[in-house]
Amino acid sequence: MRTWFSVVMLAKGGILLHAGAVVRAGRAIVFSGPSGSGKTTLARRAGRHPVLSDESVAIAPGPTGRNGNNVLYAFGTPFFGEMTEGVVNDHAPVGEVFLISANRSLVTGDPCRVADVSPAHSVGELLAQTFLRSLSRDALEALFPILETFVDSVRIRRLEFTPTPDVWRAIDELCG
């Protein structure tokens, strides 16, 4: 079903990502990564903030912003992970994307650490987190412009975090 939904999203100019998303200050903070990377952990620690998903997020273009820039929106989907409750059927403009992995090599005491990711590397990592399993030439020709727009429109960074109670306070400071 996710593969079919991905094909439909692609035809509409969007993508389905293996990602979670939490709405903070009116913007979706998207965290994309493979199974076991901490998507559900971050979603569960969101407190009272709306969780769009802990497993898969649809990303699609919306109206152009006031400054003429592309605005991308994150949408909740019916495909959730372990969070069967507390996920909202809503959307929000994408504020930032964090690429996450199961790596927890932080210095003790730091709730999180971020690093810039090059646009080319961002495209590659996001491509790996789509649900498109057979990438034909036609699919790639449709997908790459979407990913390029995504990378050009939204700040994408790598996030390593320790799942402490104050991890979102640290993320909010980083997104400030």
Describe the function of each predicted region.
Residues 1-16:
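N-terminal pre-Walker A segment at the start of P-loop NTPase domains
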Residues 18-20, 24-34, 45-176:
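Glycine-rich, often acidic-flanked micro-motifs
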Residues 37-39:
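Conserved glycine(s) of the Walker
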Residues 42:
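Hydrophobic positions on the alpha1 helix immediately C-terminal to the Walker A/P-loop
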